[in-house]
């Protein structure tokens, strides 16, 4: 409600009745314990959610019956940089480092390990599935929707990862290597039996979806399902389709494909901004997506994958009239001649007289893309006559790997040059002084 320390998670039944599902404000007396993520078992009967105490990266994973909200006692501690992936209703995979001794800030983070926790057993008996032999900072595992395979990703940085798999249908199966280097980003999107759909930036800086069979995983056997384009690809799956989310100049557009790579449709979004979602199980007939921009509060829509039609499902009640404001995207020139996008938002009728108080925001690091999103704090700023500008600096992920690399290491100065040039543009165009 804007006054609480933590956001509250609700659920809604088919009749539209809402109830609180998880309220992180009740996790601690001082409100500093937050919800760090949650994952449901395949049938939705169980949920594992992570909590972070006092902002720590070390988390606890708590298991709860979804229907009754009864905690069942399988609390896992000392978990860090981890998701949770269920295998049937029997247990789940998670990742962590060795338990820290003394100060948690000094704990080593070069031996990330993947474990399997079987429900109703002690954590100390959890099986080590992968890791511990070679220094790896980030290890994660995900169970395929058909629950036949466990796919394992291992990395030493935020770019590039190894890839492995384990056949869960065979009790004595060994982990098999698919990719043994960190040269590219490789993420399993889905599988149809032994046919794998992989998202990769191998020979495709903006990413593509390729297919191959587990019996012939070598790169020379990869075939394009969704080829690389000039825009960065971020795909999802649901209802038996692949939804290719692209970012063009930091804003979203979505294409729907079948599993043969045939275009079904370009999805009509509510406007220019940021869309996310379109994910779900293959059996689902209705999918959901969110949409927001700098003047539109995040709204959830339903989507019919057969017709392409969408409708508002949940719209927040915010005392803010979006129609009174506008966002304008410009492209300014940085020190070395590179064109950099920036979105400037302000109240309609604002005079460009160089006297407007202005917030200029940028990031330019870690492959993070700054896409349009609504903020109450920014809304208050706009209501009071302020200008809000977001520059998409190099070092981010707005234009893929090349854009990211252009703001790292020996090229880090480009990030600062881009930010300075953004400020100079705002002054030159009389937004501020």
List each model region and its residues.
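Beta-propeller folds
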Residues: 1-270, 276-286, 292-298, 302-307, ...
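Serine-hydrolase catalytic core recognition
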Residues: 147, 276-433
